[in-house]
């Protein structure tokens, strides 16, 4: 899906967008053309290989620190699997760089007029507070609540959060 950007274009300084000599983004070491529109995010770098072994073909493999990436096709659909490492800090770095790969023209260092929307799917482990959910059960979450405060640093936090769900969770847990 393409989303039209109504803002004026500013040049993003090198201190805010670090591009490596090979044209890749700083932490992930990916170039824009190596990114699929569907991205599976896993925490553990070892899980990247577990997911990618189901790909029909592999277009690229890129590894830097805890960030391992494979882009290929699964059932004819192009997708990327990326390890984020542990913690919200690493996830923030990963998602910020994915957005830059999708929506910044690296040559002039400006946001693209037409926005590219990525589909991010988090695949990993989780805890649960419901007694009927047992260790090893498979779950599909439609929403989540973060208590790390990260979204407070982003414009429009309340527009993307389910405030009713947050309030109900706090009330239920006594936080």
Please place each PLM-identified region on the residue numbering.
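Metabolite-binding pocket within alpha/beta catalytic cores that recognizes anionic/polar moieties
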Residues: 2-175
């Amino acid at each position: 899906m393409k989303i039209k950007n109504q803002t004026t274009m500013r040049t993003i300084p090198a201190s805010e967008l670090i591009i490596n000599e090979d044209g890749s983004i700083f932490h992930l070491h990916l170039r824009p053309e190596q990114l699929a529109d569907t991205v599976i995010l896993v925490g553990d770098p070892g899980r990247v290989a577990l997911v990618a072994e189901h790909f029909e073909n592999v277009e690229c493999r890129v590894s830097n620190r805890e960030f391992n990436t494979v882009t290929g096709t699964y059932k004819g659909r192009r997708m990327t699997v990326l390890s984020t490492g542990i913690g919200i800090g690493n996830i923030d770095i990963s998602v910020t760089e994915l957005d830059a790969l999708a929506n910044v023209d690296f040559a002039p260092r400006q946001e693209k007029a037409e926005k590219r929307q990525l589909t991010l799917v988090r695949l990993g482990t989780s805890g649960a507070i419901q007694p009927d959910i047992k260790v090893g059960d498979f779950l599909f979450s439609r929403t989540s609540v973060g208590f790390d405060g990260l979204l407070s640093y982003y414009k429009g936090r309340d527009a993307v959060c389910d405030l009713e769900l947050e309030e109900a969770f706090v009330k239920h847990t006594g936080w």
